[in-house]
Regions:
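Positively charged n-region of N-terminal signal peptides that target proteins for export
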Residues: 1-5
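Intrinsically disordered, low-complexity repeat segments enriched in small/polar residues
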Residues: 6-7, 22
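Bacterial N-terminal signal peptides
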Residues: 8-17
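N-terminus-centered regions that define maturation/targeting leaders and the start
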Residues: 22-201
Length: 201
């Protein structure tokens, strides 16, 4: 009888612990996409196109921006920043493919192709390619897959706080000024998408 009681108590404690972990996981600031899975190869259509980048033969796609959705934005968030970076681009110097900010916390995602052009849902910054909207991968051929990182940053800055046309470096400097702690960030959610040229799944 004592053994059964101990087992029952242990089982109940385990159940409570699992429930608490599940509840905590449900509250995590999360970025997701129906276009690709985190850490997996992205479809060819998200790569930049020859129509946009006629002088770059490495652009083999249709420049269709991925679908994104997010949930559990941290309390106190006043605006969101979205950054897309290829850290292996330009021989390791990095390429900023998309810089967007001033996104209202009431926005919960972007449809596929929605940010391949300017949108009133965000303030456009300035990518390495010099545009204010999504610019897809132009991965050099015959290299290992590049890791395209997508970071959604919650901030305490008002949506109109940052002017249009800022680079990624200028945005991050505004978010975390070195001489003026604390940072203006409330949390971050991210994904990584892979792309290789020649493309294959």
């Amino acid at each position: 009888m004592i053994k059964k009681s101990i087992f029952a108590v242990a089982s109940a404690a385990l159940a409570v612990g699992c429930t608490a972990v599940a509840a905590e996981a449900a509250d995590i600031f999360t970025l997701e996409s129906t276009t690709f899975a985190d850490g997996k190869m992205m479809p060819k259509k998200v790569a930049n196109s020859k129509a946009n980048m006629a002088t770059n033969p490495n652009c083999v796609g249709d420049d269709i921006s991925p679908q994104f959705s997010w949930r559990n934005v941290p309390d106190g968030t006043k605006s969101l920043v979205f950054l897309m970076i290829d850290p292996e681009g330009r021989g390791g110097a990095g390429v900023n493919h998309w810089v967007a900010y001033g996104i209202s916390p009431s926005v919960t995602g972007f449809a596929e192709g929605e940010v391949s052009k300017p949108s009133d849902k965000y303030v456009g910054g300035k990518s390495t390619q010099g545009v204010a909207f999504y610019s897809g991968p132009c991965t050099p051929p015959n290299q290992m897959a590049h890791h395209y990182t997508f970071d959604l940053i919650a901030t305490d800055l008002a949506p109109t706080e940052l002017p249009p046309g800022l680079t990624r470096e200028e945005v991050t400097a505004k978010l975390a000024p070195p001489a003026q702690p604390p940072a203006h960030t409330k949390g971050v959610a991210g994904m990584v998408g892979l792309f290789v040229n020649p493309w294959h799944e």
